[in-house]
Amino acid sequence: VGSINDAREEIINLCKIKKIHQIPIVDNKGNLIGIEVLNELISNKKKSNKVILMVGGLGTRLHPLTEKTPKPMLEVGKKPILLTIVEKFAEYGYSDIVMCVNHKADIIRDYFGDGAKFGVNIEYVLEDKRMGTAGALSLINEKITEPFFVMNGDLLTNVNFQHLHDFHTSNLSMATMCVRDYDFEIPYGVVNIKNTKILSIDEKPLHKFFVNAGIYIFDPEVLQFIPKDQFYDMPTLFNKLINENLKIISFPIREYWIDIGRTEELEKANNEFNKEF
């Protein structure tokens, strides 16, 4: 049995070790979400689901590095962050890519072109103003008929995109958000008080949360909830879907993931790249 958190290469190796041609994949609760076929994993058959990459950010926190270079084009592991993202999707057969560009769009277009030299097809949507993490989706003219991925262009991850897709579809979800564990320790003793009475004292309590990992998969029907030609971010979209009583779920990421928003994360990603990729 394979896990939803196993990478493609791990599943291939497991099939070879066990000398099997098919392997069931289960989620973290042991529920069956799909079956992987060894021949399909090795052949890397191309899939028709679109991948929409949000790459128009200003990268303000990474100045001066982003004064001449858009953040997704900063190098990690001696190649642009965005190239690694494209390669990871292509590894799972997702080669139909749309890049939503704004800040220094020409640099991204000049590097990737139509994507042919990278084995993918790339189209571009130009934001002529800031549209937010969801607003740019309203600019896509082509009719989308299948579940599609959306990902921020400043992330590096080893998430299994095929398992994310299967998890989304098997749960009949309208929208699925990838989430990460985040722990926060308060460095003091926290005093719980009612009026002036001390009820309890917790010494340096550890709070655990799930945070948005910046990777999503949506059913096409979600697009009707995004207003045209205006700023609209992902939290607003998800809250709208919640208010509409639509099924939206989370997909916990256990694999490697890093958000490269500051110089500290950029340095960390460079130090870890060869080990993780």
Where do the PLM segments sit?
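The conserved cystathionine-beta-synthase
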Residues: V1-I20, V26-D27
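Short beta->alpha transition motifs characteristic of CBS
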Residues: I20-P24, N31-K45
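A conserved hydrophobic position in a structured secondary element of the catalytic/binding core
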Residues: E36, H103, M151, I193, ...
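Active-site metal-binding loops of divalent metal-dependent hydrolases
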Residues: L58, D154-L155
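Conserved N-terminal catalytic core of the sugar/cofactor nucleotidyltransferase
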Residues: K79-N152, N158, H163, K228
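Catalytic-core segments of class I nucleotidyltransferases/pyrophosphorylases
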Residues: F148-F149, L156, Q162-T169, Y182-E185, ...
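A short, conserved acidic/glycine-rich loop-to-beta-strand motif
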Residues: N171-D181
